[in-house]
């Protein structure tokens, strides 16, 4: 665990921790077998899922996104009592809301719901984990943008709900309407709605439907979504600023549009990832591509480009934050992100940021199963199966609240 403590103004009556500039063992979870760690590029809260399906949350809770029945921040992972009879297998975090996925393919949600992003059929706050109003095939993946949600079922069908701004729900509309001559409103989706149309566009901007799309992975940035199907075709939709959609322009896309760059490549994409203003893809042969804005200033990548510094690495997991990136590869962790950073790169207090991929030296020799990034922090799940694994982990300092 590395990164920034909470904002001083969030809950003044509660003491805050310190900024962690290098990786630490998270004391409250020491000895706990963790299956999933979830956060998000817009999120200041986290979800921990254990191997036996228990679900714990901690971090900011200003809208009840921890699902604990109140709006008090938690510094220590706290059991979500409303899910104690469920076996949780996955989770995703938006700005102020959370989705929880169970082994039965059901989805629960909690937190801010003013845009319907909790998917419970209304826009009332959701303080305890409540079942999303979805009927159909079991859900296998959940993802969250800032104020919208995406769920993927076992047939490869995508459903979205929440704020439709920029076309980020993929329903061929941005949902805008005028409440008065000077006040704008949105027709929010309060229940999951199927994404029906996937398209590709030619140079004349003419749209042609793409058939037989079975989505296998999906990821969300602040206001955009990227997905890959069973044939390795990559689609993106929503806000197009800084080229984060990968279509060589900055136009918003109201429905999923196929990224043409990958059509001419013999690189089957298997996973996609998204930060606030950028997207990434991992291919079957281990190559990593990035597009959009991964730094505070300067030029953006308007279409996918290979991350050359990662060539030759066996990449397993990628975590995306606001502009920072962390990668688990081989027996190392690699990170980069331009200043200002807040410790999420784990490079130490003397080298707090890096414009280029840099190995986190204190993680050398550690096998990281998964890396997840929040708004200004990083969570890593490390292997501890062997005596050597345990010895390597013992060299890390421990952080306790």
Give the predicted meaning of each segment.
Residues 1-401:
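Eukaryote-biased RCC1-like beta-propeller repeat architecture
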């Amino acid at each position: 665990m590395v990164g920034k403590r909470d904002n001083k103004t969030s809950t003044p009556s509660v003491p805050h921790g310190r900024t962690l500039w290098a990786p630490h063992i998270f004391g409250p979870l020491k000895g706990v077998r963790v299956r999933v760690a979830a956060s998000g590029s817009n999120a200041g809260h986290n979800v921990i899922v254990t191997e036996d399906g228990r679900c714990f949350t901690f971090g900011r809770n200003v809208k009840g996104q921890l699902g604990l029945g109140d709006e008090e921040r938690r510094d220590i992972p706290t059991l979500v009592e409303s899910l104690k009879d469920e076996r949780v297998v996955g989770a995703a975090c938006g700005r102020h809301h959370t989705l929880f996925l169970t082994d039965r393919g059901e989805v629960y949600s909690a937190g801010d719901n003013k845009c319907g992003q909790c998917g419970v059929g209304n826009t009332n706050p959701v303080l305890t984990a409540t079942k999303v109003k979805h009927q159909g095939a079991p859900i296998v993946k959940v993802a969250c943008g800032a104020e919208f949600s995406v769920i993927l079922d076992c047939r490869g069908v995508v459903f979205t709900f929440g704020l439709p701004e920029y076309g980020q729900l993929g329903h061929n509309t941005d949902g805008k309407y005028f409440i008065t001559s000077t006040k704008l409103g949105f027709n929010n989706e309060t229940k999951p709605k199927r994404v029906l149309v996937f398209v590709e566009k030619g140079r004349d901007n003419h749209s042609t439907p793409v058939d037989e799309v079975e989505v296998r992975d999906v990821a969300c940035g602040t206001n955009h979504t990227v997905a890959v199907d069973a044939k390795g075709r990559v689609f993106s939709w929503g806000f197009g600023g800084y080229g984060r959609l990968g279509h060589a322009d900055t136009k918003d896309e109201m429905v999923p549009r196929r990224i043409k760059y990958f059509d001419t490549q013999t690189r089957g994409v298997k996973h996609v990832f998204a930060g606030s203003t950028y997207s990434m893809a991992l291919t079957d042969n281990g190559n990593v591509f990035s597009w959009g804005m991964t730094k505070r200033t300067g030029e953006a990548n308007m279409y996918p480009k290979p991350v050359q510094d990662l060539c030759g690495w066996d990449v397993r997991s990628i975590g995306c934050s606001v502009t920072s990136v962390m990668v688990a590869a081989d027996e190392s962790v690699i990170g980069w992100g331009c200043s200002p950073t807040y410790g999420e790169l784990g490079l130490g207090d003397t080298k707090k940021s890096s414009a280029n991929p840099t190995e986190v030296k204190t993680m050398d020799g550690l096998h990281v199963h998964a890396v997840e990034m929040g708004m200004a922090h990083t969570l890593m799940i490390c292997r501890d199966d062997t005596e050597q694994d345990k010895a390597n982990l013992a060299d890390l300092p421990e952080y306790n609240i």
